[in-house]
């Protein structure tokens, strides 16, 4: 039996795509292996969002190509990098045997068969509208047994001036609510306790097919499914977080009190240049509304430094805003010039300035994170055990930590704990990103 190995790079949305391709391959009779050295075929699902991600994708392709000197017969590249640079990959990377676009993932088993039949240098792309998966498609979940992602929409209509995702993924296309509910029910029946909703923009869910935002309705329906303990949604846009959504999050116990809101910047001129649909005043007002609506809530954000023409004063405005907002979690990016985007044609900020601003923001956030975490000492939280770390301590998350992107809670326990088990811990100590607690 042909063994197929997968490497999934980038975001959780890409991971869902990898899970669908793994499911399609398994259904077609291939064996899925987690070990590249055992694979007859290696599939790399690439990321192409920013320059660092592109470089990681290229480095991974070259690393996996080394296995062609051993057991691996074919190397296949798919994902955002292949969609964006389909004319360059086969030419510049002769080790690659086939490339697929982001809309052709279900064709992967057929591509593998064609390679075994003697075809080579295959390019499989389609100009059809955005691909959206359904609950009836095969999917092999790669996350631990206690949480799973559900991609509720594909593509993006926001057209931020720095972002190439709409060029790669197409227009915003929602899945139907009934189909999402069907998938969530199946996950619940299979034992998954946490559902994480993801999309390029979860807060615009439903606008294209229902002519109104339907995330609040979706959360309500998901909360009615038995055995699901936590429901989380990521990638919220500030202009779409309204009172209806806040009230739903507040009123539904299963919906975690956690908001992931990438704001990118706070200066109004920069926001306008970014083609963001919000304002400094709107962002500040939203943060105050969220914090006043909940007894305890976590806000995560992402900011970008070094955007074209960003002045020192405009960066200082962002810096002072971060100091004021005291985000629980903050990710920072240095602006990446993406060809084909409006921002790429603006006067660019030099790399040295970008690095300095990036480091200043991260140093500030480390202090804020420690301050926020220390406020959690002596509090009690229900957590899910994820496993053990290299020191054999248990690691866990509460509702206030999203999987993969946030810190962890190191847990001491006198009894044996199992991955996926929910226990209550008391927080004993705090660090910049992690907490320490004991089972009570």
Curated annotation (Swiss-Prot):
Q: Where does [4Fe-4S] cluster 1 bind?
A: 11, 47, 80
The entry lists its GO molecular-function terms as: 4 iron, 4 sulfur cluster binding; aspartic acid methylthiotransferase activity; metal ion binding; protein methylthiotransferase activity
Keywords assigned: 4Fe-4S, Cytoplasm, Iron, Iron-sulfur, Metal-binding, S-adenosyl-L-methionine, Transferase
Task: Write down the chemical reaction(s) this protein catalyses.
Answer: L-aspartate(89)-[ribosomal protein uS12]-hydrogen + (sulfur carrier)-SH + AH2 + 2 S-adenosyl-L-methionine = 3-methylsulfanyl-L-aspartate(89)-[ribosomal protein uS12]-hydrogen + (sulfur carrier)-H + 5'-deoxyadenosine + L-methionine + A + S-adenosyl-L-homocysteine + 2 H(+)
Cofactor details (free text)? Binds 2 [4Fe-4S] clusters. One cluster is coordinated with 3 cysteines and an exchangeable S-adenosyl-L-methionine.
What the record says about family reads: Belongs to the methylthiotransferase family. RimO subfamily.
Function comment: Catalyzes the methylthiolation of an aspartic acid residue of ribosomal protein uS12.
What protein is this chain from? Ribosomal protein uS12 methylthiotransferase RimO
Q: Which organism is it from?
A: Caldicellulosiruptor saccharolyticus (strain ATCC 43494 / DSM 8903 / Tp8T 6331)
């Amino acid at each position: 039996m042909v063994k197929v190995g997968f490497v999934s790079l980038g975001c959780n949305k890409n991971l869902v795509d990898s899970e669908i391709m793994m499911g399609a391959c398994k259904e077609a009779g291939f064996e899925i292996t987690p070990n590249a050295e055992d694979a007859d075929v290696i599939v790399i699902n690439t990321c192409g969002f920013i320059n660092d991600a592109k470089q990681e994708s290229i480095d991974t392709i070259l690393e996996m190509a080394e296995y062609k000197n051993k057991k691996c017969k074919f190397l296949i590249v798919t994902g955002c990098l292949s969609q964006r640079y389909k004319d360059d990959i086969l030419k510049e990377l002769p080790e690659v045997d086939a490339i697929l676009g982001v809309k052709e993932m279900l064709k992967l088993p057929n591509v593998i068969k064609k390679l075994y039949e003697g075809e080579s240098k295959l390019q499989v792309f389609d100009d059809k509208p955005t691909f959206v998966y359904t609950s009836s498609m095969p999917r092999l979940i790669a996350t631990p047994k206690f949480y799973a992602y559900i991609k509720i929409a594909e593509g993006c209509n926001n057209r931020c001036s720095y972002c190439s995702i709409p060029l790669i993924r197409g227009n915003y296309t929602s899945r139907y609510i009934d189909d999402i509910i069907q998938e969530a029910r199946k996950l619940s029946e299979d034992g998954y306790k946490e559902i994480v909703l993801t999309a390029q923009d979860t807060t615009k869910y439903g606008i294209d097919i229902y002519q109104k935002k339907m995330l609040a309705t979706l959360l309500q329906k998901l909360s009615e499914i038995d055995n699901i303990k936590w429901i989380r949604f990521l990638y919220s846009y500030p202009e779409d977080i309204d009172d209806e959504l806040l009230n739903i999050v507040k009123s539904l116990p299963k919906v975690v009190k956690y908001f992931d809101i990438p704001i990118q910047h706070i200066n109004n001129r920069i926001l306008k240049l970014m083609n963001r649909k919000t304002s400094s005043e709107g962002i500040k007002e939203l943060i105050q509304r969220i914090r006043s609506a909940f007894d305890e809530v976590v806000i995560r954000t992402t900011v970008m430094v070094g955007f074209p023409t960003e002045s020192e004063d405009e960066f200082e405005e962002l810096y002072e805003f971060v100091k004021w907002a005291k985000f629980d979690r903050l990710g920072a990016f240095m602006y990446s010039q993406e060809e084909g985007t409006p921002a790429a044609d603006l006067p660019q900020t030099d790399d040295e300035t970008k690095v300095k601003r990036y480091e200043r923001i991260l140093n500030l956030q480390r202090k804020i994170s420690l301050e926020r975490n220390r406020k959690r000492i002596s509090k009690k939280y229900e957590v899910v055990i994820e496993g053990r770390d290299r020191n054999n301590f248990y690691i866990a998350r509460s509702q206030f930590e999203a999987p993969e992107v946030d810190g962890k809670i190191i847990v001491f326990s006198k009894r044996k704990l199992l991955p996926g088990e929910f226990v209550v811990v008391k927080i004993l100590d705090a660090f910049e990103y992690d907490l320490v607690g004991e089972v009570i």
